[in-house]
Amino acid sequence: MATRIDVSGLTAYYGKFKAVADVNLTIEPKNVTAFIGPSGCGKSTVLRTLNRMHEVLPGARVEGQVLLDGEDLYGPGMDPVAVRRTVGMVFQRPNPFPTMSIYENVIAGLKLNGVRKKALLDERVEESLRGANLWEEVKDRLGRPGAGLSGGQQQRLCIARAIAVEPQVLLMDEPCSALDPISTLAIEDLIAKLKSSFTIVIVTHNMQQASRVSDSTAFFSLEKTGDPGRLVEYDKTSQIFSNPKEKRTEDYISGRFG
């Protein structure tokens, strides 16, 4: 079952620098939520707090709560590795493991989780590649390097790798920014398909993409460079793009700044 995410009073730091302040929002299950806003507004930081990926940077910490179906992501005894199994992530640039085959890329997380049976691995590889709309393109060359695929195929391979461990949430940090328009369309079509099984949160600088793929949109901004980013407005995407409540939101989506 896809997961609901409740964020309350979230403030994120990198050392002494306050990157984002007092974020409150609820992300509904099996929806696509887009995070938009100018560079430096904290949208990617908020995304990374949803599976504790920000903690890979020294001095990173958070205040507030992130609840996954009521369970505190930052509660005592919560294992970040277990969190990342539940909340998968796809990064800005396709990052297949360069020395691994397509098959090995997909099963990498499964093997880390202790799955060893060949029949189960084979089944999960096909399921995941089909889920990522990639199976028909690679089924006859699973033993070849994943890095030999095109950029768009590599990104879909990374999505297959992420969904192979059966997460409930998929985070996508500008997943199309390094791709050509045709590959971007393929990823957008895939996102529309995946939301029937996963809660999806996507960071994007592309306003048209946000309006096309998302059900809800969160607009983040900041007063000036060096200030913490803040959530300005969060609503259904149709509302944000047709009748935003905040002037800053309207100015941003209409291209007046950012």
UniProtKB/Swiss-Prot annotation:
Matches recorded under Pfam families? ABC_tran
Q: What is this protein called?
A: Phosphate import ATP-binding protein PstB
- In terms of superkingdom, the source organism counts as Bacteria
Boundaries of each ABC transporter domain copy? 5-247
Residue ranges crossing the lipid bilayer per the database entry: none
Q: Which GO terms describe its molecular function?
A: ATP binding; ATP hydrolysis activity; ATPase-coupled phosphate ion transmembrane transporter activity
Q: Which organism is it from?
A: Frankia casuarinae (strain DSM 45818 / CECT 9043 / HFP020203 / CcI3)
**Which gene name belongs to this protein?**
pstB
Q: How does it assemble?
A: The complex is composed of two ATP-binding proteins (PstB), two transmembrane proteins (PstC and PstA) and a solute-binding protein (PstS).
